[in-house]
Regions:
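Conserved class I S-adenosyl-L-methionine
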Residues: 1-38, 52, 136-152
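Short glycine-centered segments of the SAM/dcSAM-binding site in methyltransferase folds
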Residues: 42, 133-134
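A short glycine-rich, Lys/Arg-flanked "PGG" loop and its adjoining helix->strand segment in the class I
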Residues: 120-131
Length: 152
């Protein structure tokens, strides 16, 4: 899939995304523990979709969350759900967007397979980390489950 196809796919599915979200709170909690998401942290949520992890970040007392997603519809929905000064959303390609950097935690959750050049993404995100910051790439589903989830 090229980026245009990815945008079209996620724009089409955005209205039902939250209802169809397969969520395992224990797995998410462990992922965020390992990502060192903690009070006072600046978090970059890559391919944030409708902001499904934003409540988890806020519950941990983070200083700020920046969500970025290539899908305008996903960002529109996310922005409508979280009217907080601690949360901001950017519609754009994380590999090209102008980002402030110095993030304590960068999380790529349920999205890494959608990036056609993984090393390019890792290099880009690594450059946005604050000293001692963490980059976490995690997925809550198996490859088979992912394929089934995105087959529509």
């Amino acid at each position: 899939m090229d980026k245009k196809d990815v945008i079209e796919f996620f724009d089409r599915h955005a209205p039902d995304w939250d209802a169809e979200m397969i969520r395992n709170d224990a797995v998410i909690s462990t992922i965020l523990d390992n990502a060192n998401v903690r009070a006072g942290a600046r978090v970059l949520d890559v391919a944030c979709g409708t902001g499904v992890l934003v409540p988890d970040y806020l519950a941990r007392g983070v200083a700020s969350v920046t969500g970025i997603d290539i899908s305008p519809e996903m960002i529109r929905i996310a922005a409508g759900k979280f009217p907080s000064d601690k949360v901001s959303f950017i519609c754009g390609d994380v590999e090209e967007a102008a980002l402030d950097g110095d993030y304590d935690c960068i999380v790529v959750y349920n999205a890494f397979p959608h990036f056609p050049q993984p090393q390019r993404l890792i290099n880009r995100l690594s450059g946005l980390l604050a000293p001692g910051g963490t980059l976490t790439v995690a997925h809550g589903m198996s490859r088979r489950a992912i394929d089934g989830h995105h087959s529509g």
